[in-house]
Amino acid sequence: MTNQTQMMEFLLVRFTENWVLLRLHALLFSLIYLTAVLMNLVIILLMILDHRLHMAMYFFLRHLSFLDLCLISATVPKSILNSVASTDSISFLGCVLQLFLVVLLAGSEIGILTAMSYDRYAAICCPLHCEAVMSRGLCVQLMALSWLNRGALGLLYTAGTFSLNFYGSDELHQFFCDVPALLKLTCSKEHAIISVSVAIGVCYAFSCLVCIVVSYVYIFSAVLRISQRQRQSKAFSNCVPHLIVVTVFLVTGAVAYLKPGSDAPSILDLLVSVFYSVAPPTLNPVIYCLKNKDIKSALSKVLWNVRSSGVMKR
């Protein structure tokens, strides 16, 4: 196999060669995946069913849950299947689709997190005009811009990557198809399209980071002017988790895409990939919704209705 037209499949790296640990990995990833899917589906359904959860903040949370659901479904099930079936292969077309989805979904998540920071700025710094500032039309426009931007960049990344010539080796140093891992297999010296794609991606991520930082500078300035300690504490508790999520997501993504490549995968490389592809979809529902009174109230209402309907049938 000398180029990508003859490359029929790729081999994904295993977390371990030990048979017992491989099954343990499959079990752990299965639990993580089922937990993430269940939590994100519940959040989406609650926000659709309860009219109180139709504000801008919940609009973004609903779409974030949808993105998280898609992102973890793009990578984890294949890793679980390979561990259970004791195989490492992924088809060429499967790799193309997986790469496109990861770039699209991860990038769109950055856009949503940026929009959420602006929504928090509007809620804290302009509380009387929040609904006017974060109108339904603006929310839809921000969402569409994020999807279109990352969709175009995803196509550019995917087309640029698979237009390159590959070595005879088809072993990826990653548990899913990702640009850095694929570039290690290429024998092409010129990566012009990829270089342009990375530059655009870095500019996009940096501009999102700047918007988030500026929003939080205004937010923390406004919070520090609040006289009541209880209200200050509540505002900080709502904002700090979001800031932590953004920081971890951007830092791990930057490390994965910008650090120099190595000849063999390290456990650190795999952990970094887990942090930006598996951890966010699992942790976001907990971070954003566990202490949210409106969501807890909506869940209690749904459970009560289900229980009441069951009693009535009896």
UniProtKB/Swiss-Prot annotation:
Residues 1-23, 74-97, 153-194, 257-269 are extracellular. GO terms for molecular function: G protein-coupled receptor activity; odorant binding; olfactory receptor activity. InterPro entries: GPCR_Rhodpsn (IPR000276), GPCR_Rhodpsn_7TM (IPR017452), Olfact_rcpt (IPR000725), Olfactory_GPCR (IPR050516). It is a multi-pass membrane protein. Keywords: Cell membrane, Disulfide bond, G-protein coupled receptor, Glycoprotein, Membrane, Olfaction, Receptor, Sensory transduction, Transducer, Transmembrane, Transmembrane helix. Glycans are attached at residue 3. It comes from the Eukaryota. This is Olfactory receptor 14K1. Its main location: membrane.
